[in-house]
Structure formats: structure tokens, C-alpha cells
Regions:
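Short, conserved alpha-helix that lines the donor NDP-sugar binding/gating region
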Residues: 1-2, 97-98
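Short aromatic/hydrophobic "clamp" motif used to bind/position activated sugar donors
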Residues: 9
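The conserved acidic donor/metal-binding loop of glycosyltransferases
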Residues: 13-17
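Conserved donor NDP-sugar-binding/catalytic core segment of glycosyltransferases
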Residues: 21-52
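A recurrent flexible, glycine/aromatic-enriched loop bordering the glycosyltransferase active site
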Residues: 38, 44-45, 52-75
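Catalytic beta-strand/loop signature of glycosyltransferases that borders the donor
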Residues: 41, 107-115
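Acidic donor-binding loop at a coil-to-helix junction in glycosyltransferase catalytic cores
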Residues: 90-96, 105
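Nucleotide-sugar-dependent glycosyltransferase catalytic core
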Residues: 105, 118-145
Length: 153
């Protein structure tokens, strides 16, 4: 982050899908909220094992809170100047958000669009070893079409 330039910093994950309007979409909440960090909690998820797309946490959009998904972090440069990401192999995203909240920064969950959380069926592929029960709780099954057809606007 020290080498970055500009007023905002975004965190991406190379195994998830980001739509062509993702960055513009994530910048919008900074115009109508007083959030310091934005991201997505309500997300589209492609579950490879079931070959279906789901909407996760459908009620968790357009609201302040204490959690957004790590691969969707988008924050003001000032945040990274005052709160450092811990050097951990697991839990760095959650701890970063906790540290930001403790420092007085506000977190805002945006809409689910322009991002797809890709959940592979290969064991050990993901840092978070979640069960299917954990992944599919609080979801709405959408269908087996290409996940981009639901998510990208």
C-alpha cells in the first residue's frame, strides 16, 4: 500500500470476478455517505460444487456495519496511513476492519453488483475453509446461468 498513488486503495482477489463497472460502482458511496471504507457484504456467489449462483446475505446492502468482504475493500488513502494490515496468513481482513473501527473509521456495505465471489470445489483452495452449510446459509438460489449475467450491470 505504501507504493500506491491516488486517493483510494482497493483490494482485489485473483480468483473472484470483477465487472467492468466495479471501480466506478465502489466509488459512488463516497459521494453520498461519510464512510471511510466501503465493500460488499451482500454478494453474488458462484458455488462450483452445485454449479449454481446464489445471492449471499441479501439484506446486508446499503448500510453501515462492521464487516465487508476482504476482496471488496475500497478505502480512503488516509485509512492506510493510520491503520496497517497485519501480517497474518489468516484473519488479516477481519482484523484490519476491527482495527479501523477501533480507530473511528466508518464501514459501509454497498450493493452486490459488479462482483462475484467464486467458491471452488477443490478442498484447500481457499484460505477460509467453510463448509457448504456455512456458505449456503442466508442465501437465495438464483440459478445455473453464468454468474456474470446476474451480477454485472
Amino acid at each position: 500500500m505504501e507504493l500506491s498513488k491516488g486517493n483510494f486503495i482497493a483490494k482485489f482477489d485473483d480468483d473472484d470476478l470483477y465487472g467492468p463497472n466495479y471501480i466506478a460502482d465502489q466509488l459512488l458511496p463516497f459521494e453520498y455517505t461519510d464512510a471511510d471504507i466501503v465493500g460488499k457484504l451482500c454478494t453474488f456467489m458462484y458455488h462450483e460444487k452445485s454449479a449454481k449462483t446464489y445471492l449471499r446475505f441479501p439484506k446486508n446492502r446499503h448500510k453501515y456495519g462492521d464487516l465487508v468482504l476482504g476482496p471488496t475493500f475500497f478505502f480512503k488513502r488516509e485509512v492506510s496511513e493510520n491503520v496497517k494490515m497485519r501480517d497474518l496468513s489468516k484473519g488479516e481482513d477481519t482484523n484490519f476492519l476491527k482495527d479501523c473501527l477501533n480507530a473511528g473509521y466508518k464501514i459501509y456495505a454497498t450493493d452486490p453488483y459488479n462482483f462475484v465471489y467464486m467458491r471452488k470445489k477443490v478442498e484447500g483452495f481457499h484460505t477460509w475453509d467453510a463448509t457448504d452449510e456455512q456458505l449456503l446459509s442466508n442465501t437465495i438460489a438464483l440459478g445455473s446461468e453464468n454468474p456474470e449475467s446476474y451480477a454485472f450491470v
